[in-house]
Each structure stands twice: as C-alpha cells, then as structure tokens.
Design a protein with these regions (language model features):
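N-terminal membrane topogenic signal
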Residues: 1-12, 146-148
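Hydrophobic alpha-helical membrane-insertion segments
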Residues: 8-22, 80-99
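Alpha-helical transmembrane segments of multi-pass membrane proteins
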Residues: 15-30, 126
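Membrane-interface interhelical loops and short amphipathic "cap" helices
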Residues: 26-48, 103-121
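Hydrophobic alpha-helical transmembrane segments
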Residues: 47-59, 116-138
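Canonical alpha-helical transmembrane segments
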Residues: 54-72
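Alpha-helical transmembrane segments and immediately adjacent membrane-interfacial amphipathic helices
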Residues: 57-62, 91-102, 129-142
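Cytosolic juxtamembrane helix at the C-terminal end of the final transmembrane segment
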Residues: 68, 136-154
Length: 154
C-alpha cells in the first residue's frame, strides 16, 4: 500500500471519528448508550453503535466511490477498499430494510383488513432495495474493471 493511500485511509478515519464525536459526543461511544425511536405506540431502542457504524460506512463508501471514479478504476487499493465498504453497506442496508419491513407488518391491526399499499414505509423499503441493487452493480462493475486493469498491468 502506498503512502498516499495510507494517508487517505487515516484522513477518512479521522474525519469519521470527528463527525461521530460531534454528532453523538463521548457518550455515544459507550456500550450502554442507546437511542429511543418512538413511532406511534412502538418504541425502537437502538444502540448508538449501529448509528456510528452506519455513518462510518456511508462516509467511507462515498469517499472511496469518488476516488475510484476519479482515478478511473486504476488504483487497486482504492478499488479493494471500495468493495469492502460496499459489502459493509449492503450489510447495514439489509438491517435497515428488516427494521422498515417489520414496521410495515405492524400496521395491520384488524383481523380482516385490506392490504395497505403505497404507504411511506413501503416506499422507503422500495427505495432501500433500489439503493442495494445499485451498490451491488457498482461492486460488480468495480471488480470487473479492477480485474481488467490488473490483467493489463501483468
């Protein structure tokens, strides 16, 4: 790994830490710190670690997406970091989709109710699935271009 890549990786990590400290404070990094989300009569208690992980993955993904596109897939290290961040973002988005889908199932309250379509959470779920598909396509394309560039270099 080149020195420039190490500096970019450390700089991005420091930026993520500063942003997380400014948003969540020192208490946000403690194991017992949680965030309560109240939606109608349902409470979701989510550890702050999940929000910190989400923000960190999104920042790393966006920084290395821009670096990868700017360098035209020529830098192997940037491409690998991008693919790792893409896989982590798929993991995080899958968890968010499961939370949204569980809330879609809670909306049914009667025994013989009609199915509700086009609710806000239904649209959010579809948008998250679309983002997930776009990330998978970007990772596949990045792997393809990395393989082509790596083969040309040998």
């Amino acid at each position: 790994m080149k020195r420039k890549e190490i500096f970019w990786l450390i700089g991005t990590a420091i930026f993520v830490l500063i942003l997380n400290f400014s948003l969540f404070g020192v208490n946000g990094f403690k194991a017992e710190s949680v965030t309560d989300i109240n939606i109608h009569d349902t409470y979701f208690v989510i550890a702050n670690f999940h929000f910190i992980l989400l923000l960190s993955v999104l920042i790393f993904f966006s920084v290395y997406l821009l670096r990868m596109l700017r360098r035209n897939f020529k830098n192997l290290t940037v491409n690998l970091i991008f693919m790792i961040c893409g896989i982590l973002s798929i993991w995080v988005l899958t968890g968010i989709i499961s939370i949204v889908s569980s809330y879609i199932g809670v909306t049914e309250t009667t025994e013989y109710n009609l199915p509700v379509t086009n609710t806000m959470f239904d649209n959010v779920s579809k948008l998250l699935y679309l983002i997930l598909i776009i990330i998978v396509i970007l990772i596949a394309y990045s792997g393809f271009k990395t393989g082509l560039n790596y083969r040309k270099a040998e």
